């Protein structure tokens, strides 16, 4: 059935490059370094710039003690710091254990200990939960990043003022290090090392199921899993290329979000517009502002879209693809989306 949706000139088979997730991104970066890789509240980064940032962050994690095969838990929304960390850790050959930042603290503890993470990247908004369970986990070092770190100057200051009380980081605990200091100090101290170019078939990413059929499970995914998804998408979405734009509303702690809105996007050489939290009321203005050429979502996202303010008057000619997954899209909703 899939063949009916594939361009007649596209090959029905493909080879998966024998590289890591970082290796796939590097192919795009080497091919078009000046193309936009991601955008975040108006802050833009090209592929060439992103590659440099990944190497710097990779050096910082290595200096912190992360090595090939280590598990690093990431407790973050869709931010540049989270995405850079995923590819930086993949460059080392470490395994990213990605957890929903709104998980209850006992769930966070369980996920961390289930993979034996010695290192944690957390959003500042999760610090209270992390502090409550840190002594009961395997974590030795905590890197704290803020959703405001990569925002434009004025927006960053406003975010800091708004959240300064609720996002307090323990001042007297040496296990914590802020993102800016982490990158600046540790990358400067990193000794030369040869990043792994090998496939880690055991696991590159660990995600967690929702527990709909029982106890939530750890889902281990390899570099090849993600790269196969990327190559399949390149063939299926045959007219997507450099300059296209994906609205990354689906979260990175879900396979659909990390796989399509981030990794597949980078395989295309397209731009991922990172949205850290979904606001249904602002969905119409978000679409109008960014004009994505591709939209990937679950049915509830499309329900929010058709009911959002300003959508009825919006010219959707910028949109090449609207793809729904994760659940059945009801026919009445499909008709509204296509109207």
Please report, for each region that a protein language model flagged, where it lies by residue.
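Conserved pre-ATP/AMP-binding loop-to-beta segment of ANL
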Residues: 167-208, 215, 238-245
């Amino acid at each position: 059935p899939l063949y009916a949706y594939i361009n007649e000139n596209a090959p029905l088979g493909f080879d998966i490059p024998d590289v890591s997730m970082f290796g796939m991104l590097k192919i795009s970066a080497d091919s078009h370094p000046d193309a936009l890789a991601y955008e975040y509240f108006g802050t833009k980064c090209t592929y060439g710039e992103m590659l440099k940032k990944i190497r710097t962050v990779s050096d910082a994690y290595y200096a912190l003690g992360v090595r090939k095969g280590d598990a690093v838990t990431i407790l973050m929304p869709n931010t540049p710091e989270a995405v850079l960390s995923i590819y930086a850790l993949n460059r080392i050959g470490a395994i990213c254990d990605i957890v929903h930042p709104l998980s209850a603290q006992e769930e966070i503890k369980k996920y961390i200990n289930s993979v034996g993470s010695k290192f944690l990247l957390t959003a500042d908004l999760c610090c209270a939960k992390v502090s409550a369970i840190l002594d009961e986990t395997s974590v030795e070092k905590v890197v704290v990043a803020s959703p405001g770190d990569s925002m434009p100057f004025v927006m960053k200051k406003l975010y800091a003022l708004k959240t300064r009380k609720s996002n307090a980081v323990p001042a007297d605990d040496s296990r914590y290090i802020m993102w800016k200091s982490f990158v600046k100090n540790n990358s400067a101290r990193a000794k030369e090392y040869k990043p792994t170019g090998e496939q880690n078939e055991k696991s590159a990413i660990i995600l967690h199921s929702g527990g709909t059929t029982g106890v939530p499970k750890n889902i281990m995914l390899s570099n090849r899993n993600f790269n196969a998804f990327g190559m399949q998408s390149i063939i299926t979405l045959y007219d997507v290329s450099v300059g296209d734009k994906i609205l990354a509303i689906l979260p990175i702690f879900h396979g659909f979000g990390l796989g399509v809105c981030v990794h597949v996007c980078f395989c295309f050489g397209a731009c991922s517009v990172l949205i850290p939290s979904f606001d249904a009321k602002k969905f119409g203005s978000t679409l109008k502002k960014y004009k994505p050429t591709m939209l990937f979502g679950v049915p509830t996202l499309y329900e929010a879209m058709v009911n959002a303010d300003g959508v009825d008057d919006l010219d959707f000619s910028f949109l090449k693809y609207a793809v729904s997954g994760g659940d059945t899209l009801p026919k009445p909703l499909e008709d509204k989306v296509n109207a």
